[in-house]
Amino acid sequence: MPIITKISTQKRKGRYNIFIDNEYAFSVSERTLAEKRLLKGTELSLEDIEKIKKAEADSHALQLAMSYLSYQPRSVYEVLTYLNKQGISPEASQSAIENLIELNYLDDNNFARLFIQNNLRVGKDGPRSISSKLKQKGVANDIIQDSLYEVDDEEWIEAGMRLIHSIGHQVGKMSYKEIKQKALKKLQTHGFNQELGELVVDQLDLESTEDDQLEALKKQGIKAWRRYRRDDDFKRRQKVKRYLFQHGFSSGEIDSFLSGEVVNLEEIDEY
């Protein structure tokens, strides 16, 4: 039966080299050395050696995983992916995952809730974007949906307002309609559906006077009038009309600009 003939320390603290029948066999941690009572002269069967190697592999995988988790919460899938990249065997990785779940260090339900709450506190993503990100982290869809269901609309509105609050500063520069359209579009690209997006937009401070709308019409109108100055008068007016309509101004407002009621069009051409 194989016999341990030598045990030497490695440069790496807490690691030991095991020699069997005067040849290097494997290395172990100080914990394994003590738990398995590995001493010079100890006889080991081939089965014993395999059990020791497995225990070492499992222990190494667990330590790597715990170190990875020390920086921030992770999903089960993220930890498995990390261990795989570190060259850990599937068996050792699975053993580490099972241990971490038992120790409550890994829990996709808690992970999903923490991920969502962090976004609600400092992020700007809506439900769809968060759902997509959690799926990329390997969280099951039913866990994601259950976690999202726990969030009130008011909390989503706060996150949405962080995303679009600067758009509210465009009063007097863009039409009310364009401001709302721009805000809704931005919300939708960040995962807010139409209904939730409208709830967010309703919180924007868009209270203004007719003078603000008139100022926005003036700025956008002058911009368009100058842009199409190379066209003949008919085409120029048609293009300006289309431009202002696309920017949320009503037909009446557009007509008032083109008739010269807002600003003298001839004076614009002089500059």
Swiss-Prot record:
Signal peptide, first to last residue: none
Protein name per its UniProtKB record: Regulatory protein RecX
Family: Belongs to the RecX family.
Keyword Cytoplasm: yes
Source taxon at top rank: Bacteria
GO biological process, one term: regulation of DNA repair
GO cellular component, one term: cytoplasm
Function: Modulates RecA activity.
Cellular compartment(s): Cytoplasm
PANTHER family linked: REGULATORY PROTEIN RECX FAMILY PROTEIN
HAMAP family: RecX
Primary site of residence: cytoplasm
Underlying gene: recX
UniProt source species: Lactobacillus johnsonii (strain CNCM I-12250 / La1 / NCC 533)
InterPro entries, per database record: RecX_HTH_1st, RecX_HTH_2nd, RecX_HTH_3rd, Regulatory_RecX, WH-like_DNA-bd_sf
Keyword terms: Cytoplasm
